[in-house]
Amino acid sequence: MKVGIIGAMEPEVAHLIASMDNAESQTIAGIEFVAGTLDGKEVIVTRSGIGKVAASIATTLLIEKYTPDAVINTGSAGGFVDTLAIGDIVISSEVRHHDVDVTAFGYEIGQMAQQPAAFMPDEKLKAAANKAVASLGEVKAIEGLICTGDSFICDPVRTKTMLEHFPTMAACEMEGAAIAQVCHQFAVPFVVIRSLSDNANNDSPVDFDSYIVKAGHHSALMVMSLLKHL
């Protein structure tokens, strides 16, 4: 099984790349793809860059050039669940855009025209992720709705509006739904796994800078453990 792994920033993929064997790097359109093995599993790891357009480009190139059997999106996110702490993990139960609004044409809030309202992760990948939780010691993990938009959320007013639109949202970030949409159109199984770097409030910029390395490391460990269950 060949698995594509996408993270937006260097701290989100550095641990994975450092742990790879037989790594070979190729740069396409300014995006580096590193192919090799992790614990004997064939993987391609890429740092997509931040935001939905960058993530869409990277995912499309990954699928077209490397034909993975599955795609895992790893990295950090802002948290919306009081029982989770910075460093804890959200495994996607579904993924939605939070900054899309074509409701004037009868679509749900967050639903892009001619696309499903939610992108559903692969059940086998989710099951493997849940099995991997035990290897992370005291790190807590839940399944939940992950929402995506091209904004770093740190405004309580905006947070309140988002929760009114998506009351079950567990985490928000800037790439997952774009990756999920590309995987949906290519019929490639996916899952999004995010470690919390902040709590999507006024302190988020400070928290993010302080904890992004920790969040990226936890998410990478989760992915490496997940691979053992595939």
Swiss-Prot record:
Record: active site: 12, 198
Q: What is this protein called?
A: 5'-methylthioadenosine/S-adenosylhomocysteine nucleosidase
Q: Which GO terms describe its biological process?
A: L-methionine salvage from methylthioadenosine; L-methionine salvage from S-adenosylmethionine; nucleoside catabolic process
E.C. designation(s): 3.2.2.9
Question: Which family is this protein grouped under?
Answer: Belongs to the PNP/UDP phosphorylase family. MtnN subfamily.
Give the UniProt entry's GO cellular component terms. cytosol
Species lineage, top-down?
A: Bacteria, Pseudomonadati, Pseudomonadota, Gammaproteobacteria, Alteromonadales
Residues binding substrate are 78, 153, 174-175
- Per the UniProt record, the source organism is Shewanella woodyi (strain ATCC 51908 / MS32)
> Record keywords: Hydrolase included?
yes
Pathway, per Swiss-Prot/TrEMBL? Amino-acid biosynthesis; L-methionine biosynthesis via salvage pathway; S-methyl-5-thio-alpha-D-ribose 1-phosphate from S-methyl-5'-thioadenosine (hydrolase route): step 1/2
Entry superkingdom: Bacteria
Q: Please explain the role this protein plays, according to its UniProt record.
A: Catalyzes the irreversible cleavage of the glycosidic bond in both 5'-methylthioadenosine (MTA) and S-adenosylhomocysteine (SAH/AdoHcy) to adenine and the corresponding thioribose, 5'-methylthioribose and S-ribosylhomocysteine, respectively. Also cleaves 5'-deoxyadenosine, a toxic by-product of radical S-adenosylmethionine (SAM) enzymes, into 5-deoxyribose and adenine.
Q: What Gene Ontology molecular function terms does this protein carry?
A: adenosylhomocysteine nucleosidase activity; methylthioadenosine nucleosidase activity
Q: Which reaction does it catalyse?
A: S-adenosyl-L-homocysteine + H2O = S-(5-deoxy-D-ribos-5-yl)-L-homocysteine + adenine; S-methyl-5'-thioadenosine + H2O = 5-(methylsulfanyl)-D-ribose + adenine; 5'-deoxyadenosine + H2O = 5-deoxy-D-ribose + adenine
The alphabetized UniProt keywords are: Amino-acid biosynthesis, Hydrolase, Methionine biosynthesis
**Catalytic class of the enzyme:** hydrolase
* Gene from which the chain derives: mtnN
